[in-house]
Swiss-Prot record:
Provenance organism: Arabidopsis thaliana
Tissue expression summary: Expressed in cotyledons, roots and flowers.
Keyword list, A-Z: Mitochondrion, Plant defense, Transit peptide
Transit peptide: 1-27
The protein's name in its UniProt record: Protein NONRESPONDING TO OXYLIPINS 2, mitochondrial
Chief subcellular location: mitochondrion
One record GO biological process: root development
Length: 93
């Protein structure tokens, strides 16, 4: 699962990086002649965005561990909770 997220995020990140590095050709607006500073469109450097990509494997590993620890299979092939999270809320289950 983590490798799937990693393999999907690499092409998306490289496409995003190439889109951010393309020079944009825009005609000068009237506000640039008046002296009004342009509004910052996207102020995060690419280095900070790269750290978001490194968190994807951690997120999928934590989500997988939580799912595995909450659902277990006992010897009678019925669902049970390994850590007893819902046993106190639903005593009849």
């Amino acid at each position: 699962m983590a490798s799937r997220c990693r393999s999907l995020s690499k092409p998306a990140f490289s496409a995003f990086r190439s889109a951010m590095n393309k020079p944009s050709i825009r005609p000068k607006s009237a506000s640039s002649f008046i002296g009004v500073p342009p509004s910052p469109g996207f102020s995060r450097p690419i280095g900070q965005l790269g750290s978001l990509q490194s968190l994807l494997p951690l997120y999928s590993a934590v989500a997988s561990a939580r799912l595995t620890s909450c659902l277990g299979i006992d010897s009678q092939n019925s669902r049970s909770l390994a850590q007893g999270m819902l046993c106190s809320a639903n005593p009849g289950v």
